[in-house]
């Protein structure tokens, strides 16, 4: 008789009676999306199909990705552990545990967290990074009791594009343009370029982004993404809204930019807004955002969302002037192993 236990069998043995661990399935996305959507603002709601699309574009790597079925066969919980979107040189891993609200307070979370941490220690990871959201009742308290400490907050906010009026900030845009800075869309820039020049533009944009990225007050130092990943997700994915991605040019030099991605059918998301170190304090970021919101409105979007790290008071202040409304914070967590 074969008495060999699989990894999921081992996890199942730690779960309450009737619950069963198994490998993650593609069909798990629907119930997880429904569960999350029930707890967040309607503008933050996503779809299982979008989740699939992004993972097809950039397949994640996991050391552990399991789901737990309830006695009735419905999805009850899950856990993940892997190097994350941008792997860290020191071997830090990103992990998480989720339990459906209907199945909490039964020990599922503790059992799965133990599995995650054992796997991370086996990989000799120095720490686990994770996150939760202030909208998820009790989640921060649960994590804190288990040794995870809050290391930062990322503030998501939105503005109703249809109601946006850029007139009060027209003078800022005028001053920037009068200084010799050209504000234009990526769509316009690409129309001016042949394939070779287009390829060079994307590489120039990525290079210009690097010092801006380094200056973001991340809760945990985050390496600038490789050009191949940038190209795959920004250039080749078809997700960027070129008509609402604005670049500030000083001659041929990229002084600043704000990039917009499509989310759902009628929302845009600011992926990055950055200003070169030599150009700060001149109103470029404000001018870019004014142009962005006007372009988003013309493109038929009803709302724009963005995320800023809590210490980034300058950018958050600009967004407040533009009418952005804050949503519950994403809370960054860390546990040293």
Task: Annotate the PLM regions.
Residues 1-15, 101, 105, 113-197, ...:
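Acyl-donor-binding surface of acyltransferase catalytic domains
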Residues 2-54, 67-69, 74, 175-224:
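Short amphipathic alpha-helix that is part of the acyltransferase structural core
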Residues 26-29, 36-135, 156, 250-268, ...:
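Conserved donor-binding loop and adjoining core beta-sheet/short helix segment
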Residues 27, 137-138, 313-314:
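Short alpha-helical
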Residues 105-118, 145, 275, 281-294, ...:
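Conserved acetyl-CoA-binding loop-helix of GNAT-fold acetyltransferases
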Residues 146-165, 244, 294, 299-337:
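Active-site/acyl-donor-binding loops of N-acyltransferases
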Residues 219, 226-247, 251-252, 257:
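A mid-sequence, solvent-exposed acidic-amphipathic segment
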Residues 255-272, 280-291, 295-301, 305:
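Extended hydrophobic/aromatic segments used for targeting, binding, or gating
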